[in-house]
């Protein structure tokens, strides 16, 4: 099929409806099997909230993509890899997997796509530099790293009601818009489906949340956004397709990088939870949970718009705007105390 507006509307509504209808059922299921979120050091939540909501997002996305795109070679790879990752997420939401096991699951899920379905960043056409080709021994690890980076970035911001789902929605719209403009209807349809699924879920996940997406959801979102952008980059090799998701998620990516630097400096494990992420610092600065989420949405929308301007209009101007904004952003993040020393909170194991 082509990319008629009717087709996109159907893709969007199918994902939205399936996720919206299934979320209450997933919620009951999560409660029954004990996949509930207990408040801990990183959480700002009180009381038990069911996890696993990502299952409903996954279902909405899959049903919509299968109905509209079908099983094209690359999309099949993305769906298989995402399904592997969803199983890792479910296990993690039920029993809390060790960080190393989770990382291994992420690597394998990415490898399925990159190795068996050849979805990788094998060449890129950079403005002013021309075409750069990567040999397999670079493109395969590079693409796996790219996917894992997005998985963990979205995973990291899933700390406040509606935060990850809303940010993923905005980023998905930006990627869909670019793909649509470049005539890549499969990438566009996939991101439109993701937008619908996230919005269907947000109805239940916005503050005060009745359900969390859990790692099932956040890892799935990161995976699909990363994988679809790689799939798109293979068609055109324009750097644009990779720049948009990077810049759209500039805030959480910067937050992730700062978190890793902060933890290395403090000598604690990279994946250990702490409360120094930007959203925690904004809460500490006196904003309500809802206000913090809206500030993060606004930042994401701003960066997404900037990214689209960059790649459609003037690369130099856009890059300047983005670097300037990032500079201001990092300055404020430091001022808010994002880089403070990490003091590890007592873990659940210590309390038992």
Model segments located where?
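Membrane-embedded alpha-helical core segments of multi-pass
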Residues: 83-88, 105-117, 142-155, 168-174, ...
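Membrane-interfacial loop-to-helix junctions in multi-pass transporters
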Residues: 133-143, 188
């Amino acid at each position: 099929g082509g990319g008629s507006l009717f087709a996109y509307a159907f893709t969007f509504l199918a994902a939205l409806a399936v996720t919206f209808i299934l979320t209450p059922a997933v919620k009951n299921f999560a409660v029954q099997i004990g996949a509930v979120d207990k408040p801990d050091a990183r959480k700002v939540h009180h009381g038990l909230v069911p996890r696993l909501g990502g299952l409903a997002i996954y279902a909405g996305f899959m049903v919509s993509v299968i109905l509209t795109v079908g099983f094209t070679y690359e999309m099949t790879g993305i769906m298989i890899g995402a399904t592997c990752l969803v199983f890792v997420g479910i296990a993690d939401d039920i029993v809390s997997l060790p960080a190393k096991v989770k990382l291994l699951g992420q690597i394998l899920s990415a490898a399925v796509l990159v190795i068996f379905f050849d979805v990788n960043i094998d060449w890129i056409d950079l403005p002013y530099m021309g075409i750069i080709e990567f040999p397999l021994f670079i493109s395969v690890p590079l693409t796996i790293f790219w996917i894992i980076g997005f998985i963990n970035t979205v995973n990291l911001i899933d700390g406040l009601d509606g935060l990850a789902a809303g940010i993923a929605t905005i980023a998905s719209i930006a990627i869909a818009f670019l793909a649509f403009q470049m005539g890549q209807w499969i990438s566009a349809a996939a991101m439109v489906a993701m937008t619908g699924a996230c919005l269907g879920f947000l109805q239940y996940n916005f503050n005060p949340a009745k359900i969390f997406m859990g790692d099932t959801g956040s890892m799935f979102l990161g995976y699909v956004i990363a994988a679809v952008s790689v799939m798109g980059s293979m068609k055109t090799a324009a750097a644009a397709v990779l720049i948009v998701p990077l810049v759209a998620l500039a805030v959480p990516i910067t937050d992730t990088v700062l978190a890793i630097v902060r933890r290395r400096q403090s000598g604690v494990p990279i994946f250990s939870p702490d409360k120094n992420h930007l959203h925690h610092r904004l809460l500490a600065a006196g904003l309500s949970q809802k206000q913090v989420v809206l500030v993060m949405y606004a930042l994401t929308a701003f960066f997404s718009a900037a990214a689209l301007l960059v790649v459609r209009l003037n690369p130099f101007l856009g890059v300047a705007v983005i670097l300037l904004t990032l500079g201001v952003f990092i300055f404020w993040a430091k001022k808010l105390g994002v880089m403070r020393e990490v003091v590890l909170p007592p873990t659940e194991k210590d309390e038992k």
